[in-house]
Every structure is written in C-alpha cells, then in structure tokens.
Amino acid sequence: MSKTWVVVAESSRAKIFQVEKNESHQSLKELEGFTHSTSRSHKNQLNGSQQKDSRDSQLTDSLDSHKDHERGEFARTLGHHLNNARNKGLFKKLILMSPPKFLGDLRKNLGHETNKFVVSAIDKNLVRHNIQEIQAHIPARY
C-alpha cells in the first residue's frame, strides 16, 4: 500500500493526514497536529503597547518582519519533521496544502530528497476546514 501524507498548514498551525483507501472509498486519517504559538501572538503582545504616533509605520514594518521570521521558523520546524518522516519511510507521496507564502517557505525547508516525494502542492489555506473539505481538494489519483 502506498502511503500518502497530506500536510495542511499555515504560518502558525499544521495538520498531517494519511490517505486511507479501499476499493471504493478514500478518506483521511489525522496523524498529527502542530501549532507555533509565537506566530499567533497578537500585535499588542509583540510590542507591549498601542502607540499611535509617527513610529506606527516603523512598528508595522518591525511586526511584519517578526511575522515573516516566525513563519520561517515554523516552516523550518515542520520541514525538519517531514524530512525525518521521509528518512523513516513513513510516507511515499506528499501532498502540501498551504497559502502561497507559507507553501514557499515550507518547500525551501524540505530537503532535496523530500521535495521529490511532493506529488501535489495546492496553494489554499485549508487548515481550519473540516476533513471533508480538505479531502475534496485532493486529486482522486492519490
């Protein structure tokens, strides 16, 4: 049986599913879930105040930079996990579902060999959707 994993992720959370198939039916089984709480911090938690002055633009740039950094950290963590899983032979095919920015970050953090296992990359944020909605985006051939 070919093991296909589906990774549904965004900048602060991810879920990993395995495709379960029988003769007439395909379903998803959730294997793991991840959260990156630092990425989910609110603006006020990051800067400690609600200043309204000429520094707002600089503050916004700083917060955007922080968000980019945290998104990259989470992509590295998830990429490392997937690289290890591939080394252990836990999947044979990998389907990625993520918003474009995080999808790019994640692909950069997958090893060359792990990237070879990616059979589909879908640039949609489905991490908060139910299993049926996620499954509807998986091509039937997987």
Question: Which residues are covered by each model-predicted region?
Answer:
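Terminal alpha-helical anchor/extension segments at protein ends
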Residues: 1-142
